[in-house]
Amino acid sequence: AVTIEYVSSDCVGVNARNVFAASPSSNKVFSIEAANNNLWVVYGGYNLSFDPLNKKFGYSHYNGSSTESTLWVNKAYDPAFPAQDLVHITIDPSADNKAYLSSWGSGMMVVDQDEPVVIWDDSNSGLEDLYQDGEPESSIRVNGAAFDNRGNFWITNAWVPNKLKKLETNGNWKGFDLSSIITETVALGLTELAIDKTGSVWIGSRRNGALVYNESGDRKRALNTQGTSGSLPDLNVRTLAVDRNNRIWIGTLKGLVVFSDAESLFELDIYDAEPVIIDDNGVPKKLLGDQPVNSIAIDGAENKWFGTDTGGALGTNPSGSQTLYNFNKDNSPLPSNSILKIKVDNSTGKVYFATDKGIVAFNSEVAPYGDALGEVYAYPNPVKKEHEFSRTEFDLLFDDSGNFSPPEIVENKENEKRVEE
C-alpha cells in the first residue's frame, strides 16, 4: 500500500489511503532537500536575472522519524532572524535535524532542532557583501553549498571577489577567487554546487558555464560552450550531479551533457562534455534534446532523474541510455510539468519532485544505497510516452491551505487497491 500525502498543491481528487493534515506552509516552493526520512522546503527565490524577490516565507521541515504528533514544522519569517529569499538547503551530514539555509540576500541561516540559531553574514563569517562598507544597502547572495568527505563546508557567494567559500572543520573560513575563469562579468549568478570524487568543486552559473576549482594546487578551469573547452549546449548551467563513476552530469538551459574524465580535467588540452545519445526507434537522439534541465538527482541504484522546465520528469538507468520513467501531469499525479527540483531520499527510496504547483513523492522502492531493486521496475521498459502511472504508486505532498480534508475512500475488493468514491 502507498500513502498519499497532500502537502502543498492546488490539485485535489487523487486516490489515497492516508492523508497528512499537516503540510508545508505554501505550495509556492523554490527548493527542497531530502535525507534519512527528512524533507526540508524553502520558498524564497530570485528571477531569471537572479534578482532577489524579497520573499519572507520561512521554511518547513518534515521529520518522518519524529515521535511527535505533528511531523511537519513550519517556521514563518522571523524578524529576529531576518533571512529572506531562502533558496537552498544543506542538511548537516551528522545531524538530520540541523540544516543550513542559503539566502539570496541575507547570507546563510543555521537551523538546529527546527529553530534558527544564527545567520552567517559578513560580520560573523567569511561570507561577503556585494556592497562596500559604508553603503546603505546590503546583499549577501548565497546559493549552492555542500559538505566534502572531510567535513568541510563549501559555499557559493555571488557577486563578490571570492565567489567560493570554505568553512573548515576547525571553524576557519577561506575564500577563493575565481575571477580568472569568469568571462561574463555582468551576469554573475551562481546556482548549484557539487563536489566530485577528487575533491574538485563544481559550480553552476548563469552565463559562465561550469566553474571548477580544486584546492590542491589552486587549480581552476571553466567548461563553456566552445569546442575543446567544454562544448556545453549553453552557458546557463542550472544543475550538477556527480555519480559513483565520477561522471559529472550537467543540466543547462538548452539540454544535458556529461563530462566523463573529471580526474584528468586540469591536465587535458581538450575537455569536452558530451550529450547522452539514445536510440529512438532506430534514430539516434540526444537524451532530453534541447530542453532546459532544472534539476538532476541520482538514486541509490545510480539511476538518473531529470527535472525539466516544461516536459515533466524523466528517470533513466545509470548510463541514461534507457528510460525507466517518464512522468508528466497527464500520466501521473504531477501537478505541473515544470520541475524545479528533484531530490532522492536513499533511506526510503522516495524521489521528491518540487514543481511550481507543489511537491510529489514517488516510491521508487530502490533499497537504501542501491542494495536491491523493487518490483516497481515492472513498468514498460523502455517506458512508452503514452504510458499512464497509477496514482497509488505515488505519495502526493500537497495542500495550499494546511487543512486538507481527505477524499472519501473505499476498498476496491477486485484489485485490493483503494479508490476514490
Description of each model-found segment:
Residues 1-379, 386-391, 397-398:
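Carboxylate-rich, polar loop motifs that coordinate divalent cations or form catalytic acidic clusters
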Residues 388, 395-421:
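C-terminal outer-membrane/trafficking sorting elements
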